Amino acid sequence: VYIKISEGVGTPDEKAKANALAAKENGLQIGYYHFGRPDKKNDNTIELDATAEAAEVKILLTDLPVADLPLMLDLEDTASFDSSLAPKEYLTWVETFLSFFFDPVNPSTNPLIYGRKEYLERKLPPTHTLGTRYKLWLSRYTDDQNKAVPAKGWNKWHIWQFSEKGVLGTNGNLDLNLKRVTD
């Protein structure tokens, strides 16, 4: 189970700790995700903005139950936010943020990148190499696995989110995902 811990800077998810404890109490593995807001709003530079978001995530993680799964960086647009950064700037932001969590010695703990193929291909330069260091969590709502094509820069998805209409012991919808058993 992945639990949202924050979005941008200054917006921690107040339910993250309770959600994590409840999931652990029910025997579930947990991981956390940060909804990235790649822009220049913090100190007016890409690097300082990404650093501010990463630093806040690191602080938030110290007060939460230990994760069983790697951190995930959620990259998507919403009705209220879509990054205006050019592709090279967007890549710089993503690489700066992820550098705070990258472990070359233990790559299985490196963060995942979550996003839709179309969004990632629009925001990132086509020649980026993020897929060599970070696994892709692909959001593609279809029940046809052949249509779950990874974004440029990745040769396969690690996790595929195929629906947002799952309901299992909750009051609302849950996202449904498949994880590759082997990479």
Where are these regions (language model features)?
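Short hydrophobic/aromatic-enriched beta-strand-loop microsegments
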Residues: V1-I3, G31, R133-S139
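Substrate-binding cleft of extracellular glycoside hydrolase catalytic domains
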Residues: Y2-D103, S108
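Conserved beta-strand positions
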Residues: I3, L73-L75, I113, L138, ...
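Short beta-strand/turn micro-motifs composed of small residues
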Residues: H34, G115, R140
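Glycine-rich, charge-decorated loop segments at or immediately adjacent to ligand/cofactor-binding or catalytic sites
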Residues: K41-D49, Y119-L130
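A short secondary-structure junction signal
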Residues: S83-A86, R122-T127, N171
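Aromatic-lined carbohydrate-recognition surfaces of secreted/lumenal glycan-active proteins
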Residues: N106-R122, K135, I159
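Functionally critical loop-and-helix segments that line ligand-binding/catalytic clefts
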Residues: T127-D183
